C-alpha cells in the first residue's frame, strides 16, 4: 500500500513542494539513465546523469533555509532548529551516497566497495525508522 502525502510529509519532514521537487528529479534522472544505458548519449558522463539529484538537493537546501528563517522570525526557534537539523541530515546522507556512487561509476575503483557506498543509505533508513516510531 502506498503512503498518503500527509504521511510522507510527517515521516520525511519535507514540505509538499520539496517532495514534488525530488520526485521530478527522479523522473529526469530516470530518463537520463535510460539514455546513458541504451547508448543514445555515449558522451554523457555519470556526473551529468546525476545532475537532477544534485539540483534537487541544492534547491531543497535553499527552501529549508527560507523556512528556517521564517520560523525564527515567527518565534518558533525550537521547531526551526529541529527541522533544519533533520532536513540537512537527510540531504547530507543522500548527497554523500550520490557522490560515492558517481565516483564508483566513473572510476570503477576497487577502494570504493559497495558496503561503503550504501552506508549512508543504511544510516538514513535507521533514522527514518526512529522518526516513524516517534511520529506515530
From Swiss-Prot:
Q: What does this protein do?
A: Involved in the regulation of cellular calcium homeotasis. May act as a regulator of STING-mediated inflammatory signaling in macrophages.
Q: What is this protein called?
A: Transmembrane protein 203
Pfam families per the record? Tmemb_185A (PF10269)
* Annotated TM spans: 14-34, 50-72, 81-101, 112-132
Which compartment or compartments is the protein found in?
A: Endoplasmic reticulum membrane; Endoplasmic reticulum-Golgi intermediate compartment
Q: Which organism is it from?
A: Xenopus laevis (African clawed frog)
InterPro entries in UniProt: TM_Fragile-X-F-assoc (IPR019396)
Signal sequence residues: none
Amino acid at each position: 500500500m502506498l503512503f498518503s502525502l500527509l504521511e510522507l510529509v510527517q515521516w520525511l519532514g519535507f514540505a509538499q513542494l520539496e517532495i514534488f521537487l525530488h520526485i521530478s528529479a527522479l523522473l529526469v534522472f530516470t530518463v537520463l539513465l535510460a539514455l546513458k544505458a541504451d547508448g543514445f548519449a555515449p558522451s554523457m558522463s555519470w556526473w551529468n546523469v546525476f545532475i537532477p539529484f544534485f539540483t534537487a538537493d541544492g534547491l531543497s537546501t535553499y527552501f529549508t533555509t527560507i523556512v528556517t528563517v521564517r520560523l525564527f522570525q515567527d518565534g518558533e526557534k525550537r521547531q526551526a532548529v529541529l527541522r533544519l537539523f533533520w532536513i540537512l541530515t537527510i540531504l547530507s546522507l543522500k548527497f554523500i551516497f550520490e557522490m560515492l556512487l558517481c565516483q564508483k561509476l566513473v572510476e570503477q575503483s576497487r577502494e570504493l566497495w559497495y558496503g561503503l557506498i550504501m552506508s549512508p543509505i543504511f544510516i538514513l533508513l535507521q533514522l527514518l525508522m526512529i522518526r516513524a516510531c516517534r511520529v506515530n
